[in-house]
Amino acid sequence: MITLDYRNKENVEVDSSLHNESRSASAFRSKKEARRYWIVLITLIALGLLSSYGLLVYNNPVPIDSPSFIPVVKRRIVAIVAMIIAAVCHSLSTVAFQSITNNKIITPSLLGFESLYSAIQTSTVFFFGASALINFNGIGSFLFQVVVMVFMSLILYGWLLSGKYGNLQLMLLVGIIIGTGLNSVSTFMRKLLAPSEFDILQARLFGSVNHADPAYFPIVIPMIIIVAVLIFAHSKNLNVLSLGKDVATSFGVKYQPSVIYTLVLVAILMSISTALIGPLTFYGFLVATLSYQAAATYDHRYIFPMAFAIGFLIMTSAYFLMYHVFHAQGVVSVIIELFGGIIFLTIVLRKRAL
């Protein structure tokens, strides 16, 4: 039997590389990575604010000393607020959704929110005409769309995630099937529309901050703040859930209730963003993918702020470049979706497997 005399320091060998000053028991592997995180985050926020300032005052047709300058800026502030809402909703929901599914290439769009939004808009034009779609606005119509999308997701979760044989992968599969079916029905109805009705509908189906009505903000902003705080407070559980069901269960996390709780919060954020701005399929994926690379940590307390900063910068810089550099007044979301789709295909082709 071999015994060690721990009273004699010469008999104990300590690996000094594990206890140097550059390493610490935190979300980052070293203090250098922590400093890098904060530098990147502050830089992204500063660039986002600079782009926002450019959108507000650059190329403003009204002089600053004119009484009409403030009203013009106020109208532009509405677009900035809509960009912040889109960044919060898509960044938080996509990162949380990818964590509970343990898959970095899928997005909450698989649950059919955008397909349902498209079906609601298309059926309104198809059955009641373009005038009904134009009049389909106000707080009542907005809340109706949000409630319908959240209600559909709750039915999906309660049906496929409850019980002994609840399965997250089955829920995703059913969500894809429902989304595909709704898209097929919407496409069929759009083919039967008159050209003028189709043009009006198509403008609604492209995601744009110009669709945002400031009358919705007093309802939307408090809802988003509450949900964002709840998701951020859920960060430690998401850290464990991202390791998989078996590991999360072994750590004492109630897997099924935690997943359903997260999915409900994701559904609320996605429903609000889709009803307010419109569909943005690959925007959340683009933001989440870049945030993982920039944050260099698996701690959601740090991933969420980085994702929001990147999402806000993408939105503000894209609109600034398209409006004031390229002078293209088209739908900026198409460009964002294009880059998001290219990155998605690149990652899929590089991994060769989902």
UniProtKB/Swiss-Prot annotation:
GO CC annotations, alphabetized: plasma membrane
Keywords: Cell membrane, Ion transport, Iron, Iron transport, Membrane, Transmembrane, Transmembrane helix, Transport
GO biological process, one term: siderophore-dependent iron import into cell
Transmembrane regions: 37-57, 77-97, 116-136, 141-161, 168-188, 214-234, 259-279, 302-322, 329-349
Phenotype upon gene inactivation: A mutant lacking both fpuB and fatCD permeases is incapable of using petrobactin as an iron source and exhibits attenuated virulence in a murine model of inhalational anthrax infection.
Complex and partners: The complex is composed of two ATP-binding proteins (FatE), two transmembrane proteins (FatC and FatD) and a solute-binding protein (FpuA).
Function comment: Part of an ABC transporter complex involved in ferric-petrobactin uptake. Probably responsible for the translocation of the substrate across the membrane.
Family named by the database record: Belongs to the binding-protein-dependent transport system permease family. FecCD subfamily.
Annotated protein name in UniProt: Petrobactin import system permease protein FatC
Organism listed in the record: Bacillus anthracis
Gene that this sequence comes from: fatC
